[in-house]
Amino acid sequence: MKLFFRQFGLGKPVIILHGLFGMSDNWVSIGKQLSEHFAVYIPDMRNHGQSPHDDVFSFSAMADDVLELIDDNYLGNVTLIGHSMGGKVAMQLALNHGDKVGRLMVIDISPGKYPVRHSQQQVVEAMQRVSLTGITSRKGIEDQLIYSISDFRTRQLIMKNLFRTGNNTFAWRLNLEAIHHNMDRLFDSVESDSTFGKPVLFIRGGQSDYINNDDREKILKLFPDATLETIPHAGHWVHADAPVELLKIMNDFMILK
């Protein structure tokens, strides 16, 4: 699949993969700052943003999409960065095609299996319940979402997925049906018979429970050269909670290591 992507800067290639319900827009600020030293590519994953929709929605399929982006742009020795769902895809790609990836950075996700989180399922169902017919203002949509999604930040993340149609109403950029039907897959473990022995950095938010100390064994089994850093005051959305600290860690890992 040909993914929509944004590109900034020149130099060694860096690809940033967003998480579930996200899009390339969410990483533009950090991407532009990284582009002072690197050529940064930020795609919209399948079923997100401006990329095509498809019923198939798995880590392997998404990894193949990113591989196609790498090959189409004649990239090599890529630094691959992924947050949450994007981190799982980045891990899968590094394990499947380690010759294409020079180093890997995974933000607030482990390779292990997670129980399906009620909050994620609730978000999809809340979006599916929204009536977009005749709604011409974002407030009209937020007024419907607020009853199911009380957290302001989550609502704002979701609202970024709206776009105006030709008749001045709204539609979702997300493929809600595909996400809903494949939700279990998005919490599966990353599976591979191989390992990725190049430098890997896992970054976790200290206020998040997505990576805990018990995950270390799973991480090192697949990524024997992995290290872990914690940003104490950050939650799961590390790039929103601690952009300055995250950017410093990124640059240190990519430039100094």
Show the residue positions of the predicted features:
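Catalytic active-site module of serine/aspartate enzymes centered on a nucleophile-bearing elbow/loop
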Residues: 226-257
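Active-site loop/oxyanion-hole signature of alpha/beta-hydrolase fold enzymes
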Residues: 28, 32, 41-81, 248-251
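Alpha/beta-hydrolase fold catalytic core
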Residues: 1-15, 35-38, 71, 75-76, ...
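Conserved alpha/beta-hydrolase catalytic His-Asp/Glu region
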Residues: 133-187
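Conserved HGGG/HGGXW glycine-rich cap/lid loop of the alpha/beta-hydrolase fold
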Residues: 4-52
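Flexible "cap/lid" loop of the alpha/beta hydrolase fold
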Residues: 91-95, 102-135
